[in-house]
C-alpha cells in the first residue's frame, strides 16, 4: 500500500529480477493500459492518467520500471498492476487530501477546521501537531477552537491508514497583535508612547482601526482616534482635541500622548478591522500616572490608572528605608525631613515607576522690621511713663 497526497507526485515501483531492458506494462484494476515500454520508447494507453504519468527511462537498464503519477487526485486511488517478466505486481494507491476549512489566515480567537478527503472504503485517522506543540487527533474532520497567536506557523499532520502514514504540512497564519495587553507607567507630565506591533506580516495590509479610551475618572469611554491602513501606510481620519494624539505613518501602529496627566489615566482598547476578514483584532493598553507633591507639612505620593492590588506604593528618603509602604494608590508623610524623597510603585520588589521630589529645610518665620519698630516704640513709651510716675512720687515726698 502506498499513500499519496492530493496535488503531489507519487512513484510506484516495479523491479525485474535481472538488470535488463525487458518489456513492461502498467495497468489499472480494469486491465486498461496506462503506460509501458515498446522497444526503447515509452508508450501510453488511453487512460485518464495519460497526461499525468511518466517513467524513469534512465533506470530501465537497471531493471527498474516505476510509474510516476503527477498532480494526484483522490479518484486516482485504486490498485495498479505492473506486468514484467511474465509476472504481475500489484500496488494499492490511496490518495488523501487535507485542507483548511476556508482560509489559512484566521483571526485570533477564531476556529480552525481541517477536513480530510479520503477514498471510499478507507478509514484513516489524523494527528496534528501545532507550532506550540499541542497535539490534536480526529477522523475526517479535525477542529481547533480559539486559535492563539502561538498557533501561527506550520502545522504537521500525519494521516494513518493500515499502519502506513503520509505527512502534510499546512501553514496557518493567526492574525493578531504581538501582545494582548500592555501597561505603560509614566510620571505626571512625561510623554507617553503606545505601540501596537502585529504578530504577522502580509505584503498587502488594508483595513481601519480605532482607539476607545476609558479614563479612570470618567463615567464613560470615548473614541480618541480613528485611522485607515492601506498597504502598510497609516492615515488619521479623526482625532480628539483633548488629548490630541499623534500617530506614526508606518507600521507598527504607534501613538504618542504629549503629556501623562492624572485625568488621562485609564485603559484603552485598540481595534483593527482587516479587509475581507470577519471580526477585528484587539489589543488592550493601560496607562498608570504617578504624582508626588508637597503641600504645607504634607508629602503625598499618588497613582492613577488600573493597577493590581498586589502593587506596593512607598515613600522613602533617599538611601534610607521606606518611611511608609503599603498596597494602596496614595501614601503620605507628615512633616517630612529635608532631602530627596522617592515615590516608588513596585511589584514584588521590582520598581515599575519612580518619581523624586526634594523637600527643602523649614526655617522659623523671620520678624518683620516694622514689627521691631513698633515693639521698640511701645517699650520706650512704657519706660518713659514709668520713670515719670517714679519722679512724681518722689517730688510729693
Swiss-Prot record:
Pfam families reported in the protein's UniProt record: C2-set, CD4-extracel, ig
Q: Where in the cell is it found?
A: Cell membrane
> What membrane topology is given?
Single-pass type I membrane protein
Q: Which residues lie on this side of the membrane: Cytoplasmic?
A: 392-397
Q: Which CDD domains match?
A: IgV_3_CD4 (cd07695)
Membrane-spanning residues where? 370-391
Modification after translation (UniProt): Palmitoylation and association with LCK contribute to the enrichment of CD4 in lipid rafts.
Q: Which GO terms describe its cellular component?
A: cell surface; plasma membrane
Ranges facing Extracellular side? 1-369
Positions bearing carbohydrate: 269, 298
Lipid addition (S-palmitoyl cysteine) is recorded at 392, 395
Q: Which SUPFAM superfamilies match?
A: Immunoglobulin
Oligomeric and partner information: Forms disulfide-linked homodimers at the cell surface. Interacts with LCK. Interacts with PTK2/FAK1. Binds to P4HB/PDI. Interacts with IL16; this interaction induces a CD4-dependent signaling in lymphocytes. Interacts (via Ig-like V-type domain) with MHCII alpha chain (via alpha-2 domain) and beta chain (via beta-2 domain); this interaction increases the affinity of TCR for peptide-MHCII. CD4 oligomerization via Ig-like C2-type 2 and 3 domains appears to be required for stable binding to MHCII and adhesion between T cells and APCs.
Q: What role does it play?
A: Integral membrane glycoprotein that plays an essential role in the immune response and serves multiple functions in responses against both external and internal offenses. In T-cells, functions primarily as a coreceptor for MHC class II molecule:peptide complex. The antigens presented by class II peptides are derived from extracellular proteins while class I peptides are derived from cytosolic proteins. Interacts simultaneously with the T-cell receptor (TCR) and the MHC class II presented by antigen presenting cells (APCs).
Comment field on protein domains: The Ig-like V-type domain mediates the interaction with MHCII.
Query: Per its record, how is this protein called by name?
Result: T-cell surface glycoprotein CD4
Gene transcribed to yield this protein? CD4
Amino acid at each position: 500500500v502506498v499513500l499519496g497526497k492530493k496535488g503531489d507526485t507519487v512513484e510506484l515501483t516495479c523491479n525485474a529480477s535481472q538488470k535488463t531492458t525487458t518489456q513492461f506494462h502498467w495497468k489499472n484494476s480494469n486491465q486498461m493500459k496506462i503506460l509501458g515500454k515498446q522497444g526503447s520508447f515509452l508508450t501510453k494507453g488511453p487512460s485518464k492518467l495519460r497526461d499525468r504519468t511518466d517513467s524513469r527511462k534512465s533506470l530501465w537498464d537497471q531493471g527498474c520500471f516505476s510509474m510516476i503519477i503527477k498532480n494526484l487526485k483522490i479518484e486516482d486511488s485504486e490498485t495498479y498492476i505492473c506486468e514484467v517478466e511474465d509476472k504481475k505486481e500489484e500496488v494499492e494507491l490511496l490518495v488523501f487530501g487535507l485542507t483548511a476549512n476556508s482560509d489559512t489566515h484566521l483571526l485570533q480567537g477564531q476556529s480552525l477546521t481541517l477536513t480530510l478527503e479520503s477514498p471510499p472504503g478507507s478509514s484513516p485517522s489524523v494527528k496534528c501537531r501545532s507550532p506550540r506543540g499541542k497535539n490534536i487527533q480526529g477522523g475526517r474532520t479535525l477542529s481547533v477552537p480559539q486559535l492563539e497567536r502561538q498557533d501561527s506557523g506550520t502545522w504537521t499532520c500525519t494521516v494513518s491508514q493500515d499502519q502506513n502514514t503520509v505527512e502534510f504540512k499546512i501553514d496557518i497564519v493567526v492574525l493578531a497583535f504581538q501582545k494582548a495587553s500592555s501597561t505603560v507607567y509614566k510620571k505626571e507630565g512625561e510623554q507617553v508612547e503606545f505601540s501596537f506591533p502585529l504578530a504577522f506580516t502580509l505584503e498587502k495590509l488594508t483595513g481601519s482601526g480605532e482607539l476607545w479610551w476609558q479614563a479612570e475618572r470618567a463615567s464613560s469611554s470615548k473614541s480618541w482616534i480613528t485611522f485607515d491602513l492601506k498597504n502598510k501606510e497609516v492615515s488619521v481620519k479623526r482625532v480628539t482635541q483633548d488629548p490630541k494624539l499623534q500617530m506614526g505613518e508606518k507600521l507598527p501602529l504607534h501613538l504618542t500622548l504629549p503629556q501623562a496627566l492624572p485625568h488621562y489615566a485609564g485603559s484603552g482598547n485598540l481595534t483593527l478591522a482587516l479587509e475581507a476578514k470577519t471580526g477585528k483584532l484587539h489589543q488592550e493598553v493601560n496607562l498608570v500616572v504617578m504624582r508626588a507633591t508637597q503641600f504645607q507639612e504634607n508629602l503625598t505620593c499618588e497613582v492613577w490608572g488600573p493597577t493590581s492590588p498586589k502593587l506596593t506604593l512607598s515613600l522613602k528618603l533617599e538611601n534610607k528605608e521606606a518611611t511608609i509602604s503599603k498596597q494602596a494608590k496614595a501614601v503620605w508623610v507628615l512633616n517630612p525631613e529635608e532631602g530627596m524623597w522617592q515615590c516608588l510603585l513596585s511589584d514584588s520588589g521590582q520598581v515599575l515607576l519612580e518619581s523624586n521630589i526634594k523637600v527643602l529645610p523649614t526655617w522659623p518665620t523671620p520678624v518683620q522690621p516694622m514689627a521691631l519698630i513698633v515693639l521698640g516704640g511701645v517699650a520706650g513709651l512704657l519706660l518713659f511713663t514709668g520713670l515719670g510716675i517714679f519722679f512724681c512720687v518722689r517730688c510729693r515726698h
